[in-house]
A protein has these predicted regions:
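Acidic donor-binding loop of glycosyltransferase active sites
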Residues: 27-45, 60
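A short, well-ordered alpha-helix in the C-terminal region of glycosyltransferases
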Residues: 90, 97, 104-118
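Short alpha-helical segment that forms part of, or immediately flanks, the ligand-binding pocket
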Residues: 21-24, 28, 47-58, 68-72
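Amphipathic alpha-helical segment in the mid-to-C-terminal domain
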Residues: 20, 88, 105, 118-126
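C-terminal alpha-helical cap of glycosyltransferases
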Residues: 122-139
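Nucleotide-activated donor-binding/catalytic signature segment of Leloir-type glycosyltransferases, i.e.
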Residues: 1-25, 29-32
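Structural loop-to-beta junction motif characteristic of Rossmann-like glycosyltransferase folds
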Residues: 31-32, 52, 59-62, 79
């Protein structure tokens, strides 16, 4: 944020923290969901960021900068832009592709939503959680 102020960047917006329920409205105005993490190997397979699932549910293509299961899923489902970590060039290229091909972006968003519904159905996941919690309580 300080860098944006220092360099007078007016094309970057920082929002205050918001409630989870307000995210859908904020994401409705977005073109791409960006999941950017530090290049830490433990993140490749050991994270499951909520924002990834929020973007899928909102029908947003996902741009992610680290390898691992999420990048593989994005590539396999063609619902976004998996880019290598620590590659500003790949990041810029992905943003240019997103801006230059709105039809492709829309298709990716549709596939993101389909992925959310097919692989991560809320009701089924909630039922699985209830089953686990009931097992723990009974143990």
């Amino acid at each position: 944020m300080l860098r944006c102020q220092r360099e007078n960047l007016d094309n970057v917006i920082f929002h205050d923290p918001m409630k989870k329920g307000d995210l859908a409205l904020a994401m409705a105005g977005a073109d791409v969901g960006m999941q950017i993490l530090a290049n830490v190997e433990a993140f490749y397979y050991g994270t499951s960021p909520n924002k990834f699932f929020d973007y899928l549910a909102a029908g947003l293509p996902v741009l992610t900068n680290y390898p691992g299961w999420i990048a593989g899923l994005i590539k396999e489902s063609e619902c976004g832009f998996p880019i290598p970590p620590e590659s500003p060039e790949a990041f810029a290229d992905a943003l240019e592709q997103a801006a230059d091909d709105r039809a492709r972006l829309s298709s990716m968003g549709g596939r993101a939503r389909m992925l959310a519904e097919s692989r991560f159905p809320r009701d089924e996941l909630a039922n699985q959680l209830v089953d686990v919690l009931e097992d723990v309580i009974q143990a």
